[in-house]
């Protein structure tokens, strides 16, 4: 088991966005959360990535617990435990969230360098290998503004992989891409699940993309059943 969510609830005033939701994803799966905008998909993604609190529920990744049943405030006893949970998750945002003033390789090493996981030289080598894996070995020292949407998405994926997460989350990965670029990203995601055993969770309203690469499709209407 990579990620398990039990009894998750989230409301905004009188709007119950997520109600008693259970979810599980295992290594090698590509799970698609499919649904229209406003059905709670992004809220769910933000909660499991510890970017937003739920009202109630339990979230566990490989034995590392984010929350207890009375709410999703972190229950870590130390900063190292908090990092251990967060490092199990890699997040690729809809708008990529690359730092425009940093080169591609600098974007990749920023977070692990701040955590002191390895020295700078080792991280640069790791980053170069990942960029080669996503087909961007020639873009190491350029700035994000020079890249296409598909290339930015690949950089964002490589950056998320720098911490070697067991679960990789994507928020609308094809929203800014043409179909050819979307298919290329889909192939890369499939390889991450099949070859590396990553558990992949994708939030999207792109039905074609979801059905192409998903090993399981869940509707976001289940959030507020």
Task: Indicate residue ranges for each PLM-predicted region.
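Catalytic Walker B motif of ABC-type/P-loop ATPase nucleotide-binding domains
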Residues: 168-171
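Conserved ABC ATPase signature
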Residues: 143-147, 151
């Amino acid at each position: 088991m990579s990620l398990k969510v039990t009894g998750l609830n989230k409301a905004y005033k009188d709007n119950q966005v997520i109600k008693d939701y259970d979810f599980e994803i295992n290594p090698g799966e590509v799970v698609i959360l499919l649904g229209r905008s406003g059905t709670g998909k992004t809220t769910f993604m933000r909660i499991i990535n510890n970017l937003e609190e739920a009202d109630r529920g339990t979230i566990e990744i490989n034995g590392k617990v984010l929350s207890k049943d009375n709410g999703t405030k972190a229950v870590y006893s130390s900063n190292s435990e908090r990092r251990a949970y967060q490092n199990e998750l890699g997040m690729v945002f809809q708008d990529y969230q690359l730092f425009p003033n940093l080169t591609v390789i600098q974007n990749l090493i920023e977070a692990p360098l701040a955590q002191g996981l390895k020295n700078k030289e080792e991280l640069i080598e790791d980053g170069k290998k990942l960029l080669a894996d996503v087909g961007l070995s020639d873009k190491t020292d350029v700035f994000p503004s020079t890249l296409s949407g598909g290339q930015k998405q690949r950089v964002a994926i490589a950056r998320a992989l720098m911490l070697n997460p067991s679960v990789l989350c994507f928020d609308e990965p094809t929203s800014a891409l043409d179909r050819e670029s979307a298919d290329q990203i889909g192939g890369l995601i499939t390889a991450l699940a099949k070859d590396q055993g990553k558990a992949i969770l994708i939030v999207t309203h792109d039905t074609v993309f979801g059905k192409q690469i998903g090993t399981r499709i869940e509707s976001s209407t289940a959030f507020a059943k």
